[in-house]
Amino acid sequence: MSYLFNNYKRDNIEFVDANQNELIDKDNNVYLDFSSGIGVTNLGFNMEIYQAVYNQLNLIWHSPNLYLSSIQEEVAQKLIGQRDYLAFFCNSGTEANEAAIKLARKATGKSEIIAFKKSFHGRTYGAMSATGQKKITDQFGPVVPGFKFAIFNDFNSFKSLTSNNTAAVIIEIIQGESGVLPADSLFMKQLNEYCKQKDILIIVDEVQTGIGRTGKLYAHEHYQLSPDIITLAKGLGNGLPIGAMLGKKNLGHAFGYGSHGTTFGGNRLSLAAANQTLSIINDADLLNDVQSKGQFLIENLRKSLVNKRNVIEVRGVGLMVGIEVTNDPSQVVREAKRMGLIILTAGKNVIRLLPPLTITKKQLEKGIEILTEII
């Protein structure tokens, strides 16, 4: 008997330990991790991050946001660098998107926000209302009003929905949950130019794509795009719960005293993990290596799977990769697990690969070999 709600479809396996890019179950079986806990443990199970959190455990764990926090300032500086932003820390991606929605509406005095079909921004009410998937929203009664949904990568569809009451657009650089669908470069350029012309704020949801996943600190750096607001989570704490919302400094007036807040957001344990994570991630060599390994993974998957009739396409950016197939991908996930490889699905028919950024070429080759045999 379980004491838990049955809202997850749990596999009959429990991981109890880990070693860098490998997971270990309670029977001591070892698995190669191509999931990173759904894009969370981007640096694997990293001893430098462990040590940073351990050191903080020996100091203060939590203090409310009524007092100064030098570690919040330090992590914010690493996230922002020379960019013109301010930071707000929270506990998750959905909370970061809630903050972004509130900031956009308050700063502009407008209520409409354009999102995209097949998007995913979270499961709390505002973020859920911005999600363009009926299976996520339809069971819970009326959603938050003011959201419109354009076709992803279709500029005319987006433009047709704008009005004098449009506060912002919220967009994922790569639609992860719907099948690893990257944004088109021309579309992003057109969207950026139009929004700047019409004073429409651009909110970029980097919850899954950020913190080095695509070979850049932020995935929008691959495009001609200048976001007004950026949301982050997942890989930021490398396994500890943390989210962040970055907003342009000229929006700072809208988030003054009492406008928004959180009890646990910016707590020192999660910030200790984020601080060390960013110290490692903000390394040009590491990010270049992610791009190189991502190219290696995509090219070799394409070569290995070229004659597989049930493979439609291999796509992705950096180490965020999707294999679109004609059959149910959950069957591949089960067989991969049996052979010692942990992978994910996305959308209806996509195998999603999110290996740690620290994965080795040898481990990538092993994963490709297993996938080729199964598919």
Swiss-Prot record:
Family: Belongs to the class-III pyridoxal-phosphate-dependent aminotransferase family. ArgD subfamily.
Cofactor note: Binds 1 pyridoxal phosphate per subunit.
Any one GO CC term of the record: cytoplasm
Iron recorded as keyword: no
Keywords: Amino-acid biosynthesis, Aminotransferase, Arginine biosynthesis, Cytoplasm, Pyridoxal phosphate, Transferase
Residues that bear N6-(pyridoxal phosphate)lysine: K234
Entry keyword annotation includes Heme: no
InterPro entries: AcOrn/SuccOrn_fam (IPR004636), Aminotrans_3 (IPR005814), Aminotrans_3_PPA_site (IPR049704), Class-III_PLP-dep_AT (IPR050103), PyrdxlP-dep_Trfase (IPR015424), PyrdxlP-dep_Trfase_major (IPR015421), PyrdxlP-dep_Trfase_small (IPR015422)
Binding locations of pyridoxal 5'-phosphate: G93, T94, F120, D205, E206, V207, Q208, T263
Gene3D superfamilies (UniProt xref): Aspartate Aminotransferase, domain 1, Type I PLP-dependent aspartate aminotransferase-like (Major domain)
Protein's recorded name: Acetylornithine aminotransferase
Species the sequence originates in: Staphylococcus epidermidis (strain ATCC 35984 / DSM 28319 / BCRC 17069 / CCUG 31568 / BM 3577 / RP62A)
PROSITE patterns membership: AA_TRANSFER_CLASS_3
Superkingdom per UniProt: Bacteria
Entry's localization field: Cytoplasm
Residues that, per the record, bind N(2)-acetyl-L-ornithine: R123, T262
SUPFAM superfamilies with a match to the protein in the record: PLP-dependent transferases
Pathways per UniProt: Amino-acid biosynthesis; L-arginine biosynthesis; N(2)-acetyl-L-ornithine from L-glutamate: step 4/4
Listed GO MF terms: identical protein binding; N2-acetyl-L-ornithine:2-oxoglutarate 5-aminotransferase activity; pyridoxal phosphate binding
Catalytic activity reported: N(2)-acetyl-L-ornithine + 2-oxoglutarate = N-acetyl-L-glutamate 5-semialdehyde + L-glutamate
Remarks, miscellaneous: May also have succinyldiaminopimelate aminotransferase activity, thus carrying out the corresponding step in lysine biosynthesis.
